[in-house]
Amino acid sequence: MSRIAYGDESIRRTGVPEPMYLLGVYIADDEQPDLADALSVYVRHAGKLHWRDHLPQTKLAVCRTISGYDASHLVVVASPLILDGGEERARQQALFCLAVHLEDKFNVHALVLERRQRSQDNKDENTIDVARRSRVLTQEFRLTHKFGRDDKRLWVPDQVVGALGDYAAGQDTGWQMIADRVL
């Protein structure tokens, strides 16, 4: 059985007690129906599904759809963020932790993250290399980057971290429907 994790991030600075960086993954299992296909019906803008673009009723419908699938999700939260920036440092710490948990607890050896600027993607790759050299990750663990419009499975973690971020900000957008599916 092949399991691949697909990851995306969210940053919350307003409406939360402390600024937070969220890095979440959807663990795709090739033996189960693909949740990303079911979420495709909610795409409003050509090419990609963004949590921040949804109307409140769509956010509830998306969470209802996610809750109907027996999929695994994992979110790492780094908080607090320093006032002037800090997102990249938080991301690298969260990525290190996330990769270790994926391999150790979920037997996942491949992670696909949404592509950002090349220099930022290089930092992700360096973080994974450090974990491999430290023997915290095996040499088999692979990290790749793809554009969200090129792989709809990247849409799933965007929805999950978006819902968690809304919940942390006191907004009722369906998090309670999916909370039991997220570790």
Mark where each language-model region is.
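Phosphate-ester processing/binding pockets and catalytic centers
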Residues: 1-183
